[in-house]
Amino acid sequence: MDTILRLSHITKSFPGVKALSDIHLEIVRGEIHALLGENGAGKSTLMKILCGIHQPDAGTIEIDGTARHFTSYHDAVAAGVGIVFQEFSLIPHLDAVDNLFLGRELRTRWGVRDRARMRRAAAGIFARLGVSIDLDAPLRTLSVAQQQFVEIGKALSLDARILILDEPTATLTPAEAEHLFAIMRELKRQGVAMIFISHHLDEIFAVCDRITVLRDGQYVATTDVSSTDVEQLVRMMVGRRLESSFPPKPVRAADAPAVLEVDALQIERDGPVNRFALHAGEILGFAGLVGSGRTETALAVIGATRAHRKTVRVRGTPAKLADPADALRAGIGLLPESRKTEGLVTSFSIRDNISLNNLGKYRSMRWLIDRRGEARTTHDVMRRVGVKAPSIHTEVATLSGGNQQKVVIARWLNHHASVLIFDEPTRGIDVGAKAEIYGLMRELTARGYAIIMISSELPEIVGMCDRVAVFRQGRIEATLEGDEIDPDTVMTHATAGTRGATHEPA
């Protein structure tokens, strides 16, 4: 094998925790190599060592047989290592050309920025990728997929021979993900070695050649994709056989009261009119393609965005939800799609995040907070939702994706919200944590909570939801329940708009 990268005996500790112990990883030139493991398995730490962001306590890095010691990210880049982070490192108001050459602009013999030469070079890079990018448009005006391609182009412009792709499909549509896979296959043909990090096992089998699995900071195994299956990979990642990750659906009570009724919701003046109802103890799925209006509908209901007209009843009482504060007072909570930027203050502790929108509950005097009472409540809700952390004072930024999501849920339970809107609740979460989130959702509905679940994961919609409202172009095309909820039926309504069910509340 033509080995381009070899990591041997990599060990790394942080105060109070051993993040990596004797890790081995070998990458062959021109292969796509998956790095798998639950959140907290050590994948990010290992990649940060490869990129020079962290230095190992022990072990060696070899590129093309030569030992390397990276003391900075620039050292790694100079050695041919590039990374496309899950959170983009682009400047939104700059165009693609300026983002590609930021900090290393090409100049004329007189020291002036040579925009024309940089533009030609950028065009050549995107031609190599086979993508069409408006070179003069600010990045913020491009689609998420196009921004992803700019990130990849930026790494290639630095002559990356080893490319790390960290959850690159997390915010892409299926069609955009397929385009990305085509680009990866072309780069593979050109001899670029890629390390692909993803929680979507179907993507691993679609595009990767080999897989290395980490668990609890330790090396588990490396295997060819053709020699394994999903069940074996899951067992290697979690250390046990994972039964069906979806809890059994309970028998739906026919007389369950409607806790949220939305009538005549019209977001735009000339847009479609939608109606739906949510009952106590159920999970109502919002399914459809990206851009079909699922999230937009939820945000309009709680007043986070304007609606041309809407009528809402909460537990049978008319409610004027003009803004999220009104929704909060009505007992409606939102777990937003982007938990890190919209759902959490990641620099705050777990305690501060959980009590953030309910500080009045802990006021002991006019301006003082009862910290002991706050701590007791925080411990209680952390236990109820299963947050795993050293203490209530742990900074949320240090938690895994699954535990961060549980902190958001804990905040709403602390506020006694009984209607919860989960927008892409398992995005960026490993298989074990997904099963925990699913179990928690069923525990909540068993206690009478009502949940709207917005998800682009079709198996999630089918496996978790008691009823499903399928969206297409802003309209609820069908409301499915029981045996009607299957992948083919959902996708038929989402793509073809076949109206097999009513638009009225079920």
UniProtKB/Swiss-Prot annotation:
The keyword Cell membrane applies. It catalyses: D-ribose(out) + ATP + H2O = D-ribose(in) + ADP + phosphate + H(+). One of its GO terms (cellular component) is plasma membrane. Residues 5-241, 251-498 form the ABC transporter domain. It is a peripheral membrane protein. Part of the ABC transporter complex RbsABC involved in ribose import. Responsible for energy coupling to the transport system. This is Ribose import ATP-binding protein RbsA 2.
